[in-house]
Curated annotation (Swiss-Prot):
Cofactor(s) essential for the protein: coenzyme F430
Alphabetical list of Pfam families matching this protein: MCR_alpha, MCR_alpha_N
The keyword Transferase appears for this protein: yes
Listed name of the protein: Methyl-coenzyme M reductase subunit alpha
GO molecular function: coenzyme-B sulfoethylthiotransferase activity; metal ion binding
UniProt enzyme class: transferase
Residues where Pros-methylhistidine is found: H257
Gene Ontology CC annotation, any one: cytoplasm
Catalyzed reactions: coenzyme B + methyl-coenzyme M = methane + coenzyme M-coenzyme B heterodisulfide
Record PTM text: The alpha subunit contains six modified amino acids near the active site region. Is methylated on His-257, Arg-271, Gln-400 and Cys-452, probably by the action of specific S-adenosylmethionine-dependent methyltransferases. Also contains a thioglycine at position 445, forming a thiopeptide bond. Contains a didehydroaspartate residue at position 450. The methylation on C5 of Arg-271 is a post-translational methylation not essential in vivo, but which plays a role for the stability and structural integrity of MCR.
Organism: Methanothermobacter thermautotrophicus (strain ATCC 29096 / DSM 1053 / JCM 10044 / NBRC 100330 / Delta H) (Methanobacterium thermoautotrophicum)
Gene: mcrA
Family: Belongs to the methyl-coenzyme M reductase alpha subunit family.
Length: 550
């Protein structure tokens, strides 16, 4: 590689040359060096004056700005933003990304159609399917179809709610109104489309998006219930059933249970979360939700690191950072994986090393390959921190560096072997090497899972091993260590990106998010984060329509 991908960011962040070994502290103007902190101070004064209770005051506690309050370049973009703008509370795009996942459920029409034809003796045709879809798109946002005197939601408040379908049968898809169809042929490259259609076959699946405002007011588990209620009512209306007849129970079962795919599984009671909450989203599902693989299919690094960014934000910033810990500092761990092109630089190095020595997906799936590739990439990453002190200051936390170096090592190993388990083994080896070199990895407890994880990479036992694609945030030992889960999701994606696979874990999930009507663009995750940081992203679920005009 010629120029380091992170050099431009370092030059923008610091006055000194990236190679300079000395700098100054305490003379930088404190929080006033930051436009965003200054804005916060002024806003805090206004809030305090209005409510009569003191609010934001950065002079309380540890003084801010003793060192450079550096901007961050969102990787793959030319956008530099302040760190505060990458906190999910301050970033509408990040909020919408999670909203669009949480409010989605996939529901089959196959069982329902069998009930209609076999129990009720009625015919199901493309025309009746289109009529049903017209009905359910009226009902899903919160409108009535079979009852009188029902209150309804304002269409403008729930404009993001709709239902589409997809099928692997081109003839059926062509007969349904295209407004309601996710066109696999249009959305995916030809080879990916053929694979996905073969997986789906003649089945017809609904992709339901309930209103953002509903999932925000309630929770993820509401999604399937809201969906099932409107689907049931729409079936009764579209196929002219009597609401109380026995077949209605079959429709309810199909819509609520039989053919329902949640984006996240139910969590144990000690975590107290239902379906479609972050802790239940498997790494392989998150990789399929991210859509980079259908537009950047010739660049496995880009594809894998877009998944890392998706997971770093969801798992680290929202799940561990707020659901689980209630803190604010977790953003700093997550941003290390998707800013300043550092992880990109390390991973492109690894990909080129693999290509030159083995060829993508051509290396033996052995520990010798793990030892070779993961060691090479780890040493490269550690050398960059030694050579460029500004890089060390950029990622000032040991856990940031450990996550980034290990992610590059894991993805690169997966590129070589076309196997996520060997990629995971490369991650753990990188952690051991890093600790040998620097004597520590991160804050106390950061490396808990890294000290014991290697023992269950290749053993698939009850609570001690799963293919990485099937693991998730609630996997044993993964549950409370920041700076891991997004990277694991990226390593899940890496072998599939190197092979050019159409999906990672579930083809239905991959297709469901290949949808141009989604508010968040899952083909360009990091670009959307940048738009959110610049306050240029327009989210759904806003309440301005029902609040006083200002």
């Amino acid at each position: 590689m010629a120029d380091k991908l992170f050099i431009n960011a370092l030059k923008k962040k610091f006055e000194e040359s990236p190679e300079e070994k000395k700098t100054t502290f305490y003379t930088l103007g404190g929080w006033k060096q930051s436009e965003r902190k200054t804005e916060f101070v002024n806003a805090g004064k206004e809030v305090a004056a209005k409510r009569g209770i003191p609010q934001y005051n950065p002079d309380i506690g540890t003084p801010l700005g003793q060192r450079v309050l550096m901007p961050y370049q969102v990787s793959t973009t030319d956008t530099f933003v302040e760190g505060d703008d990458l906190h999910f509370v301050n970033n509408a795009a990040m909020q919408q990304m999670w909203d669009d996942i949480r409010r989605t459920v996939i529901v089959g029409l196959n069982h329902a159609h069998a009930v209609i034809e076999k129990r009720l003796g009625k015919e199901v045709t493309p025309e009746t399917i289109t009529h049903y879809l017209e009905t359910v798109n009226h009902a899903m946002p919160g409108a009535a179809v079979v009852q009188e005197h029902m209150v309804e939601t304002h269409p403008a408040l729930v404009a993001d709610s709709y239902v589409k379908v997809f099928t692997g049968n081109d003839e059926i898809a062509d007969e349904i109104d295209p407004a309601f169809v996710i066109d696999i042929n249009k959305q995916f490259p030809e080879d990916q489309a053929e694979t996905l259609k073969a997986e789906v076959g003649d089945g017809i699946w609904q992709v339901v998006r309930i209103p953002t405002i509903v999932s925000r007011t309630c929770d993820g588990a509401t999604t399937s219930r809201w969906s099932a209620m409107q689907i049931g009512m729409s079936m009764i209306s579209a196929y002219k059933q009597a609401a109380g007849e026995a077949a209605t129970g079959d429709f309810a079962y199909a819509a609520k249970h039989a053919e329902v795919i949640h984006m996240g599984t139910y969590l144990p009671v000690r975590r107290a979360r239902g379906e479609n909450e972050p802790g239940g989203v498997p790494f392989g599902y998150l990789a399929d939700i991210c859509q980079s693989s259908r537009v950047n299919y010739e660049d496995p690094v880009r594809v894998s690191l877009d998944v890392v960014a998706t997971g770093a934000m969801l798992y680290d910033q929202i799940w561990l950072g707020s659901y689980m810990s209630g803190g604010v500092g977790f953003t700093q761990y997550a941003t290390a994986a998707y800013t300043d092109n550092i992880l990109d630089d390390f991973t492109y190095f690894g990909k080129e090393y693999v290509e030159d020595k083995y060829g993508l997906c051509e290396a033996p799936n052995t520990m010798d390959t793990v030892l070779d590739v993961a060691s090479e990439v780890t040493f490269y990453g550690l050398e960059q921190y030694e050579e460029y002190p500004a890089l060390l200051e950029d990622q000032f936390g040991g856990s940031q560096r450990a996550a980034v170096v290990a992610a590059a090592a894991g993805c690169s190993t997966a590129f070589a072997t076309a196997n996520a388990q060997t990629g995971l083994s490369g991650w753990y080896l990188s952690m051991y090497l890093h600790k040998e070199q620097h004597s520590r990895l991160g804050f106390y407890g950061y490396d808990l899972q890294d000290q014991c994880g290697a023992s269950n990479v290749f053993s698939i036992r009850g609570d001690e091993g799963l293919p990485l694609e099937l693991r998730g945030p609630n996997y044993p030992n993964y549950a409370m260590n920041v700076g891991h889960q997004g990277e694991y999701a990226g390593i899940s994606q890496a072998p599939h990106a190197a092979r050019g696979d159409a999906f990672v874990f579930n083809p239905l999930v991959k297709i469901a998010f290949a949808d141009d009507n989604l508010v968040f663009d899952f083909t360009n995750v990091r670009g959307e984060f940048a738009k959110g940081a610049l306050r240029e992203f327009e989210p759904a679920g806003e309440r301005a329509l029902i609040t006083p005009a200002k």
